[in-house]
């Protein structure tokens, strides 16, 4: 019975244990299934110039509206697309949206993608790559560290047709092979995984508008199931064409103004937008364990489908309610636990009420009136970013949690009356609401909705990051707080940008801990080729180092081979060396203590006492002190290097330095090394001191030996370099040698020692050293040891007492040692000493690095040396001087991508005339970080100084001198006042706030007269208009911009640019102004508006066959000012020919004008009635009288204002009278006409402007200003609702505008004259399309663009593809298509290189390889192809590798293997291979005649020998009897029917040479 009870008890125990185990497993499974997921990194690109999550927060917290007009750089027919009629086929009634105006920008080089492949890539792929990299960096993770990991990649997107409508472009052979991977949607995720080298799940999700939130849901599920441990989740949308606008216009789904008015009564549709957002997520438990900063937590998510509901694209309320409840269940939360919902909120009349009712039915039923559910919509700020909408909403809510504020929802006139708001407690965020942390210990929570037009719905529940556990205080770094801030980049330009970003970060983040930031920079940033390090012990010191080029350690990491430690001999010592490190470096102090113990057996003094210079301690003047101390310092510094991760692959010692090298190599124990250095130095002190000397000469060894022939007491002691030789011996002869060298101009330096190492004098201590060093126990080195005594590697235990005598007696071969090591692949030589003495003798082909320096023996110098090593490519372990990672890493700037524009050009057919049409457009700029100014600035003001503006300049760091320049101040008076200001330091910049042309001209002239060369900025208000929604430009102020464009050409050295402010600049606008003045944008024509910074661009204005908006024909009376001049008469003829009944031609001379009579007859013959009137068009009374006299039966219907006065003088000699004359007829006349005809119904009001006002023209400053006035006047009339068209003409053929000397000038520079008939056809088109402005010019961009920018680079022309291409063309490099074949079969390019001297061939061949590689990849310059960078990193794939092989095969005249590029993986390696194969000099010829024959034969193909009739003779010389009929007999004829000499003709030149000059057959 008892036995059964025991069995039952055991059974119950077992079952209970199993139940407990199963319960625990179920609990674990349940926990994993619902485990929260941490968001640890975020990145985005959104409308309004948003380039980061912080930018997004600034936008929404500031109630920013990011909606803008259509982009003008994508080939869209911006004007032709618009039609207010929603039924107009192929048109849209909406012409605004949320755009990424830099969507075409991409740093292809950074990602190792060739320009050609980048051009073929959907911009969505490029944005996804960029933001993915930034999201990882923002998490404090080095993206390259993820290679080989199971990172998941989940990206939402949809096909937007980047290549649609680009037929001609995509058929380009250059893009073949790239279009599939470039356009296919699956590559959105696949390319990210490929670039990062990850092998986890990679999925592209297309559920339309809900794509990115579905992607996040899938990422969460994958993490919970263990399919990956970390994941990227996000979405992207770019609209390369306007198809979406057209399609949704037919459905009447768009907001007319492009703005989503979410949940508002005024809602009228959604505003399409673009964007990209990426999150880096991992399981919460992993994030905590890995020490990653947690931004927020995904508590739960759900996805469902509408199914067969009210329509395929219609939203379905019940499905939305279900997905919300499922997400809450997944989060294990109740509706009342959520504070706010970031709604889908598109602003449609159908969708918003359905969504609101679903929210009210779920959340709204469990919220109180005191704590209602808040409802917001990011789309009201940026529009509907489609596949990126969900992730954008998540980023907004994460930022709201972090900042404790719920932003306002814009454009709500009142909450929608289509929603029953009383049915639940949901409150629309019509104003911002504080969102503080909860006092009851609860957590803030938000939910985000995203509903796809496809019917797929997603809902995600977010929670604020859990409270961070108190971490132990950050340990102060060893060494007194001196830390490195390393930064690196792929290119020098990117490095400079990185440095600038980090400097701005240090300046703006006063709370940053330098050591924590250093740890983050080391751990979370990829170490790239171009490197810099700031070293300092405080934020201020590091900031200052970043701001000053001389404060940084810089270098490159290319061609890193093996590392050798170099230990010098005497001469590195200085009093106090190493003392600071005893206190700041534990590793150094510990090693010195070991040395102290070892040395103490042989010396009666204390190592530490000597180093610290304690009273009574011996000095370094004694050889028996200095050598042991130097040894101890060197081996201790070696320990420090090794502690920081630098392990030598070899050691080299110079003289006594070989003792330290032997110890570090393991060839001597520390005790034996101490014995050698102490006892040998004692012997030197006892027997050699005072009897010798040493001298260093700047000569090679041979030259020194020649000089020593006259000195029997001297010998070469050491050969340190090609021109660095040391001599030792008799001190008297040393002095005599020094005198003779000085007399001969040879640099000589007597070394401060009184004994002669490496000379015959040493022989007297040979016996003593043999005795005292007997019993040494040398070992085989475990670190390779190269002996400068033997000139070879030491591999056996041979460093006995005899060796150390010989080391002291014989010559030191340091230079040959370095040469040998360099051949063996050693590239970096670290001189381990208290002061570098050998580094400067190293050849330029290797990198020499020091350790300490004289009087710089502390931690700062040590860290700087470590920084120099890292900057030059070595891997440094910074951990010993940095705090341990805590997970609280600072938000450092992410990589400063250096982008270029990649965008397929539209293939829409264009007429030849379209090539003449241009417009001005404004490109939104992405605002850079906080800028600052420095130095003295002069600010010219009118009567009332701009206090706020001046305050902004001062707050940015500028020292401001204000100078008032009134209308009555002439140039002389201004120059005198400027001269009086020029005392003390010079000026950094000049700002003109003048708003009138006359004082502005005087100001520019006075600056030159006063000799002030500081760059001048002209700051205006309302001088330009950046688009349809902007206020029209003020014509008078527009003249300042016309003038400025000419100053830029006439005085490029002292011109900075033009900046236009809004009428009422706020703090943000003034901050943008500072950014512009700092030069950070790189732009020189900038407009600042509430939407940000805009840069002026010239762009093509093709009509693309667009239908005219009206059928314009002249009729009635047409008034032509300047009507008897060349341009006016052309216009008159055209008007008469096309139906004008009455032509009223106005000029100053009237009928007395030359040719007036003939013109009248010609026009009359065309059927028009002609009136020629003498009248000053600038006289309003005279013009009023003239207009009143126009017959009622032919009313005035059109005006053509061609009148103007020539103005071709440089600005420096332009006086007030010239200004009045030029402006009189042109601008005053136009203003009079505008004023007198206001309200008169006209069909056309044409202003003849000029290209001078568009891009400037030298010596036409006032003329350009006048034309800018006309362009602005036309826009002002349009804004008033009256017709106006300004045409900025180029050069006309025949008599007319711009003739004479200027004609030839502009033709030479690429402005070709236009035929008047064709020019007038362009005028007719502009009128038929009712255009406000168009520039018409025939430009040869290959000539004009370089000429226009030769003295001053300008981005103005960047919007014209031909100009951009002309400016990007490499200059002075071999042409990539050079296939001209030289007589040898080589290309002419290689033949030219062959003709160069041998030392110049290698670099020339490398340039040729880089040039061809650049051409294959699509780069504009070989500079973009780094010599040492792998072809795979440069963007080569199998296709482009074969293309490069083909080009180089043509160059060398021989077919190269298909694997050539991959067999020689860098341009430098490939160039070296080609040099050896095709350019290496032949083996030295045994005789001169043989060399001449070889060269002659190498240059002559066999056909030439045969044709010359000498082939038989050459063959006979080789011992071969030619066959009959070979065609090579002297004077003989070939047999036409004979077989060709295949065996001979197939020989290459080298084979023929071997045949001719090889052994003779006997």
From Swiss-Prot:
Residue positions binding NADP(+): 1124-1127, 1147-1150, 1176-1177, 1226, 1248-1249
* Location of region: Acyltransferase: 565-866
User: Which InterPro entries did the record assign?
Assistant: Ac_transferase_dom_sf, ACP-like_sf, Acyl_transferase_dom, Acyl_Trfase/lysoPLipase, Ketoacyl_synth_AS, Ketoacyl_synth_C, Ketoacyl_synth_N, Malonyl_transacylase_ACP-bd
Any matching Pfam family: KAsynt_C_assoc
Question: Cofactor(s) for this protein?
Answer: pantetheine 4'-phosphate
Which portions of this protein are annotated as coiled-coil regions? none
The region called Module 5 is annotated at 37-1475
A GO biological process this protein is involved in? macrolide biosynthetic process
> Per the database record, which ranges form the Carrier domain?
1403-1478
Query: Does the record carry tRNA processing as a key word?
Result: no
Q: Which domain of life is it from?
A: Bacteria
Residues the record lists as O-(pantetheine 4'-phosphoryl)serine modifications: 1438
Q: Where is this region: Disordered?
A: 1519-1548
Catalytic activity, as annotated: 5 (S)-methylmalonyl-CoA + malonyl-CoA + 5 NADPH + 11 H(+) = 10-deoxymethynolide + 6 CO2 + 5 NADP(+) + 6 CoA + 2 H2O; 6 (S)-methylmalonyl-CoA + malonyl-CoA + 5 NADPH + 12 H(+) = narbonolide + 7 CO2 + 5 NADP(+) + 7 CoA + 2 H2O
Q: How is the cofactor bound?
A: Binds 1 phosphopantetheine covalently.
Q: What else is known?
A: Type I modular polyketide synthases (PKSs) catalyze the step-wise condensation of simple carboxylic acid derivatives. Organizationally, type I PKSs are arranged into modules, wherein each module is comprised of a set of catalytic activities that is responsible for a single elongation of the polyketide chain and the appropriate reductive processing of the beta-keto functionality. A minimal elongation module contains an acyl transferase (AT) domain, an acyl-carrier protein (ACP) domain, and a ketosynthase (KS) domain.
- Self-association and partners: Homodimer. Pikromycin PKS consists of a combination of multimodular (PikAI and PikAII) and monomodular (PikAIII and PikAIV) polypeptides each coding for a functional synthase subunit which participates in 1 (monomodular) or 2 (multimodular) of the six FAS-like elongation steps required for formation of the polyketide. Module 1, 2, 3, 4, 5, and 6 participating in biosynthesis steps 1, 2, 3, 4, 5, and 6, respectively.
Q: What is this protein called?
A: Pikromycin polyketide synthase component PikAIII
Which species? Streptomyces venezuelae
What's the name of its gene?
A: pikAIII
């Amino acid at each position: 019975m008892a036995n059964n009870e025991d069995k039952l008890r055991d059974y119950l125990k077992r079952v209970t244990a199993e139940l407990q185990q199963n319960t625990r497993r179920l609990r674990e499974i349940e926990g994993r299934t619902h485990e929260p997921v941490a968001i640890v990194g975020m990145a985005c690109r959104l409308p309004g110039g948003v380039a980061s999550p912080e930018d997004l927060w600034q936008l929404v917290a500031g109630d920013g509206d990011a909606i803008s007009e259509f982009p003008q750089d994508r080939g869209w027919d911006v004007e032709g697309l618009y039609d207010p009629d929603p039924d107009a086929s192929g048109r849209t009634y909406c012409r605004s949206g949320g755009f990424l105006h830099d969507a075409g920008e991409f740093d292809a080089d950074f990602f190792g993608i060739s320009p050609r492949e980048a051009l073929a890539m959907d911009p969505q792929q490029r944005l996804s790559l960029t933001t993915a990299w930034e999201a990882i960096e923002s998490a404090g993770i080095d993206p390259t560290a993820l290679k080989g990991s199971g990172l998941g990649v989940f990206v939402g997107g949809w096909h937007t047709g980047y290549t649609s409508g680009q037929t001609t472009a995509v058929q380009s052979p250059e893009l073949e092979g790239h279009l599939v991977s470039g356009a296919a949607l699956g590559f959105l995720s696949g390319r990210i995984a490929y670039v990062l080298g990850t092998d986890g799940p990679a999925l592209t999700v297309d559920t339309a508008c809900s794509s990115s939130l579905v992607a996040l849901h899938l990422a969460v599920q994958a993490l919970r199931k263990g399919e990956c441990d970390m994941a990227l989740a996000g979405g992207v949308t770019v609209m390369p064409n306007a198809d979406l606008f057209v399609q949704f216009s037919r459905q009447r789904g768009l907001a007319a103004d492009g703005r989503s008015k979410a949940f508002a009564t005024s809602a009228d549709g959604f505003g399409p937008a673009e964007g990209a957002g990426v999150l880096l997520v991992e399981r919460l438990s992993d994030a905590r364990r890995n020490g990653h900063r947690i931004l927020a937590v995904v508590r739960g998510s759900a996805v469902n489908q509408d199914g067969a509901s009210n329509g395929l694209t219609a939203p379905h309320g019940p499905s939305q309610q279900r997905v919300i409840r499922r997400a809450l269940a997944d989060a294990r939360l109740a509706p009342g636990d959520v504070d706010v919902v970031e709604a889908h909120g598109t602003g449609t009349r159908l969708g918003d009420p359905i969504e609101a009712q679903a929210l009210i039915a779920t959340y709204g039923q469990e919220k109180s009136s005191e704590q209602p559910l808040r409802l917001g919509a990011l789309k009201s700020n940026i529009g509907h970013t489609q596949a990126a909408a969900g992730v954008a909403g998540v980023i907004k809510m994460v930022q709201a949690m972090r900042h404790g504020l719920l932003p306002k929802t814009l454009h709500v006139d009142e909450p929608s009356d289509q929603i029953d708001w009383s049915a639940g407690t949901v409150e629309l965020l019509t104003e911002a609401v504080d969102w503080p942390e909860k006092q009851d210990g609860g957590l803030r929570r938000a939910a985000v909705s995203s509903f796809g037009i496809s019917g797929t719905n997603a809902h995600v529940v977010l929670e604020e990051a859990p409270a961070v556990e108190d971490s132990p205080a950050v340990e102060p770094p060893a060494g007194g707080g001196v830390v490195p801030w390393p930064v690196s980049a792929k290119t020098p330009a990117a490095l400079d940008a990185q440095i600038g970003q980090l400097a701005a970060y240090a300046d703006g983040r006063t709370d940053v801990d330098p050591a924590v930031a250093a740890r983050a920079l080391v751990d979370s940033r990829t170490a790239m080729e171009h490197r810099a390090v700031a070293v300092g012990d405080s934020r201020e010191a590091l900031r200052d180092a970043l701001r000053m080029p001389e404060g940084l350690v810089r270098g490159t990491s290319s061609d890193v081979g093996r590392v050798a430690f170099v230990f010098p001999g005497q001469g590195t010592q200085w009093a106090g060396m190493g003392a600071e490190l005893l206190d700041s470096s534990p590793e150094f102090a510990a090693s010195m203590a070991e040395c102290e113990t070892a040395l103490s057996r042989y010396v009666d003094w204390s190592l530490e006492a000597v180093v610290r210079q304690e009273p009574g301690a011996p000095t370094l003047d004694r050889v028996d002190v200095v050598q042991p101390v130097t040894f101890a310092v060197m081996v201790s510094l070696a320990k420090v290097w090794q502690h920081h991760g630098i392990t030598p692959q070899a050691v080299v010692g110079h003289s006594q330095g070989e003792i330290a090298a032997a110890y570090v190599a393991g060839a001597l124990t520390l005790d034996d090394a101490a014995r050698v250095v102490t006892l040998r130095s004692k012997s030197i002190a006892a027997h050699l001191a005072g009897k010798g000397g040493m001298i260093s000469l700047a000569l090679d060894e041979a030259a020194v030996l020649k000089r020593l022939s006259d000195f029997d007491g001297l010998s070469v002691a050491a050969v340190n370099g090609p021109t660095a030789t040391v001599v030792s011996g008799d001190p008297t002869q040393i002095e005599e040698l020094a005198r003779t060298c000085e007399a001969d101009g040879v640099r000589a330096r007597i070394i401060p020692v009184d004994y002669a190492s490496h000379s015959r004098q040493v022989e007297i201590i040979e016996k003593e050293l043999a005795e005292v060093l007997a019993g040494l126990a040398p070992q085989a080195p475990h670190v390779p040891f190269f002996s400068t005594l033997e000139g070879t590697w030491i591999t056996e235990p041979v460093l006995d007492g005899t060796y150390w005598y010989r080391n002291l007696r014989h010559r030191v071969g340091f230079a040959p040692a370095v040469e040998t090591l360099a051949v063996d692949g050693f590239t970096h030589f670290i001189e381990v000493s208290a002061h570098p003495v050998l580094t400067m003798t190293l050849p330029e082909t290797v990198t020499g690095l020091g350790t300490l320096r004289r009087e710089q023996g502390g931690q700062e110098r040590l860290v700087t040396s470590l920084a120099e090593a890292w900057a030059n490519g070595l891997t440094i372990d910074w951990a010993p001087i940095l705090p341990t990672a805590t997970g609280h890493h600072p938000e450092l700037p992410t990589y400063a991508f250096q982008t270029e524009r990649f965008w397929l050009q539209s293939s829409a057919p264009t007429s030849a005339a379209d090539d003449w049409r241009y417009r001005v457009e404004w490109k939104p700029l992405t605002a850079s970080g906080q800028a600052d100014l420095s130095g003295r600035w002069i600010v010219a003001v009118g009567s009332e100084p701009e206090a706020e503006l001046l305050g902004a300049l001062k707050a940015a760091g500028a020292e401001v001198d204000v100078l008032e320049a009134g209308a009555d101040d002439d140039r002389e008076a201004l120059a005198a006042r400027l001269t009086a200001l020029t005392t003390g330091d010079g000026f950094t910049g000049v700002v003109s706030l003048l708003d009138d042309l006359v004082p502005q001209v005087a100001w520019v002239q006075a600056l030159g007269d006063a000799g002030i060369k500081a760059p001048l900025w002209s700051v205006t208000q309302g001088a330009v208009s950046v688009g349809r929604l902007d206020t029209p430009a003020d014509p008078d102020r527009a003249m300042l911009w016309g003038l400025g464009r000419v100053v830029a050409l006439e005085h490029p050295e002292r011109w900075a640019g033009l900046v236009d402010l809004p009428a009422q600049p706020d703090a943000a606008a003034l901050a943008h102004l500072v950014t512009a003045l700092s030069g950070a944008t790189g732009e020189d024509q900038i407009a600042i508006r509430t939407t940000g910074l805009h840069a002026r661009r010239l762009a093509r204005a093709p009509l693309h066959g667009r239908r005219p908006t009206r059928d314009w024909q002249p009729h009635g009376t047409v008034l032509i000012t300047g009507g008897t001049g060349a341009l006016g008469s052309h216009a008159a003829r055209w008007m008469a020919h096309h139906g004008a009944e009455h032509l009223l031609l106005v000029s100053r001379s009237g009928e007395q004008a030359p040719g007036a009579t003939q013109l009248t007859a010609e026009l009359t013959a065309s059927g028009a009635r002609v009136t020629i009137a003498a009248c000053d068009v600038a006289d309003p009374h005279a013009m009023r009288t003239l207009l009143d006299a126009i017959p009622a039966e032919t009313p005035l219907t059109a005006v053509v204002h061609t009148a103007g006065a020539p103005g071709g003088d440089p600005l420096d000699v332009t006086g007030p009278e010239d200004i009045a004359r030029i402006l009189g007829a042109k601008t005053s006349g136009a203003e009079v006409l505008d004023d007198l005809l206001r309200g008169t119904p006209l069909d056309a009001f044409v202003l003849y402007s000029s290209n001078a006002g568009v891009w400037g023209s030298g010596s036409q400053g006032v003329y350009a200003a006048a034309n800018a006035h006309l362009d602005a006047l036309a826009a002002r009339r349009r804004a008033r609702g009256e017709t106006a068209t300004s045409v900025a003409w180029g050069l006309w053929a025949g008599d007319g505008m711009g003739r004479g000397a200027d004609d030839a000038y502009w033709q030479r520079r690429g402005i070709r004259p236009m035929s008047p008939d064709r020019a007038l056809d362009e005028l007719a088109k502009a009128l038929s399309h009712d255009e406000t402005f168009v520039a018409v010019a025939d430009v040869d961009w290959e000539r004009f663009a370089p000429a226009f920018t030769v003295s001053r680079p300008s981005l103005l022309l960047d919007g014209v593809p031909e100009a951009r291409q002309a400016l990007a063309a490499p200059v002075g490099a071999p042409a990539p298509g050079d296939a001209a074949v030289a007589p040898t079969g080589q290309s002419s390019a290689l033949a030219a290189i062959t003709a160069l001297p041998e030392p110049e061939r290698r670099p020339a061949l490398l340039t040729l390889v880089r040039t061809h590689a650049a051409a294959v990849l699509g780069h504009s310059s070989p500079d973009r192809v780094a010599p040492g960078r792998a072809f795979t990193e440069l963007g080569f794939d199998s296709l482009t590798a074969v293309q490069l092989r083909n080009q180089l095969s043509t160059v060398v005249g021989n077919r190269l293997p298909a694997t050539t590029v991959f067999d020689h993986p860098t341009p430098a390696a490939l160039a070296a291979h080609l040099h050896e194969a095709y350019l290496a000099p032949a083996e030295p010829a045994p005789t001169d005649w043989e060399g001449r024959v070889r060269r002659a034969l190498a240059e002559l193909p066999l056909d030439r020998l045969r044709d010359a009739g000498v082939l038989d003779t050459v063959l006979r010389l080789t011992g071969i009897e030619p066959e009959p009929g070979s065609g090579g007999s002297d004077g003989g004829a070939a047999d036409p029917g004979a077989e060709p000499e295949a065996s001979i003709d197939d020989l290459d030149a080298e084979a023929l040479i071997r045949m001719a000059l090889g052994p003779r057959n006997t």
